[in-house]
Amino acid sequence: MILPVVFLCLTAVVPLSTGEEPEDFDALSTNRTDQQNLIVDTHNTLRRGVKPTASNMLKMEWYAPAAKNAQNWANQCTLSHSPANMRRTSVQCGENLFMSSGPFSWSDVIQSWYNEEEDFEYGTGAKTQGAVIGHYTQVVWYNSYQIGCAVAFCPNRTYKYFYVCQYCPMGNLISSIQTPYKNGEPCGDCPDACDDGLCTKL
């Protein structure tokens, strides 16, 4: 079997930190429906707004099996990518990581990944050699429509907050990294299954 080659990406940030878990750490828990909705809605807003526009961008939904895998990995506090067998549900999943010494909201974490768009040109890929674009391309990979995320507190690490999102099916295939979606009129590939510019099925 030939396995596709994929990019995996991580981001690290070091703001000021007391080193103690804040009282509201539980507010970031993805066991909470409000956090699940925030993560899904933030992704869908960003996916809906890609430039150039996408004709085949699937609408994201929360996926509990991926969230379980993400939590299991986050709890390891390795601050590195999980092995492929820990990113599998019914399909192989992709993964974005974010590490910081203080807490960040999920919307800020996801936005930090998307901001790599500044270094990306549709049809070309990275604008400059060595530019990191893989977080962005995974966020907007057209058929990565299931997402599960988790965060862990790692008190013995410099980066005490370890955020993990897994995307199913995985994106970032090297062969098409320059075109993470199909350019065209929003919902052009799904005229009968469109929800505000995103496809509910293809």
Locations of the language-model features?
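Mature extracellular or exoplasmic CAP/SCP-family domains and secreted bioactive peptides
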Residues: 2-202
